[in-house]
Amino acid sequence: MATDIATRRFNVREFHKLAEVGILGEDDRVELLDGQIMILAPIGENHRTVVDLLAELLTDQRKGRYLVAAQNPVLIDDEDEPQPDLVLYDRAAIGRHPTPTDVFLIVEVSDTSLGYDQRSKIPVYASAGIKEVWIIDLGSYCIQTYRDPYTADRRYATTETHDRKSLVSPLAFPDIRVRLNDLVQ
């Protein structure tokens, strides 16, 4: 006879408490998704390089319009606090974790985490109404863009895949142009 295994779900307050009391360490690579503590893959050299170069490019072009955060949390709701690789968000959120209404763009860099990013994180971002998400797929060397969230269906209406030579621009800042070839060696 099969027995179902129960899981313990956490809210954001409890998740933060685990860090405060030392159960989760400062260097632990974890995030809260759908009330579950997810252990993130270690950051590889290619992943780190792309995040660093993209953060530099986006920071250089910001002109005071937004802030860039690398691998910092976004407070989605009481059960979701993911740590995207990069976030472009409104300057009004200085001093706190950005929330979905503050976010212009989320970028996930996927070296070994493509399935997790597509199946677990994209639905959370869509349900929160995050307007735009990019997944930079280092396995296929492409940028997948997700736009026009359907919150009830936890998906995006518009998805496109751009090859490494294509120029991609965030919806909120069409003057910014990103080419994957400029970020990978």
What are these regions (language model features)?
Residues 1-185:
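Gly/Pro/Ser/Thr-rich low-complexity, intrinsically disordered segments predominantly at protein N-termini
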